[in-house]
Amino acid sequence: MQQNGRTYIAIDLKAFYASVECMERGLDPLTTNLVVADASRTEKTICLAVSPSLKAYGISGRARLFEVVERVKEVNAERRRKAGCLSEKSFNANELAAYPSREVDYLIAPPRMAKYIQISSQIYNVYLKYIAPEDIHVYSIDEVMMDVTNYLQTYRMTACELAKVMISDVLHTTGITATAGIGSNLYLCKVAMDIMAKHVQPDKDGVRIAELDEMSYREQLWAHRPLTDFWRVGRGYAKKLEAIGI
């Protein structure tokens, strides 16, 4: 994808804080039920991260701890209804899928920001193996955007191939996987990652990559709702836009 002469890649580390905590415990981030939260506070505390296997039960990435507790209770009530009774607990998604009579459990990891910053820096150094720092925009601790225009010919790769190589390197270096978006400008690569990649079938490592240009954006997202899915569109803007029919 190289419309208007430029190509951009956005990369978002998957459930970053939760993935770091899983790796620190020698657990698979994709199959371990884990939330990052300060359990010493009340159950109203906000979870900083929720692992993908817990999100699969309909728990949001920024749930309050009591919402996690209640949802897991509901899941176990349904499992109990089907199995008759539940035996031992498990926080492993593969085990829970294989043994319907096991009770869904999860780990609560207290936040460790210094550790997350350390791992984020390690991952940034992986990106620097492929892309110069002036072409990398660090958007947050777990997300970057890159102008890869001048690298595709050098590496003789498509943007998708380059994204896969970098994500694979991050995975082998840290055990953490990611989602990527590719676009002909920064906005499109971000939206491709935030919206379109969610509907892409993940590969064996859980990686999803989606692409957008101006034409495919119009074709696939012109009527997309809710508007708050789009980058930088909050509830206030969405309400105003919907009021004028947009």
Regions found by a protein language model. Name each.
Residues 1-246:
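Gly/Gly-Pro- and Ser/Thr-rich, intrinsically disordered tail segments characteristic of DNA damage-repair
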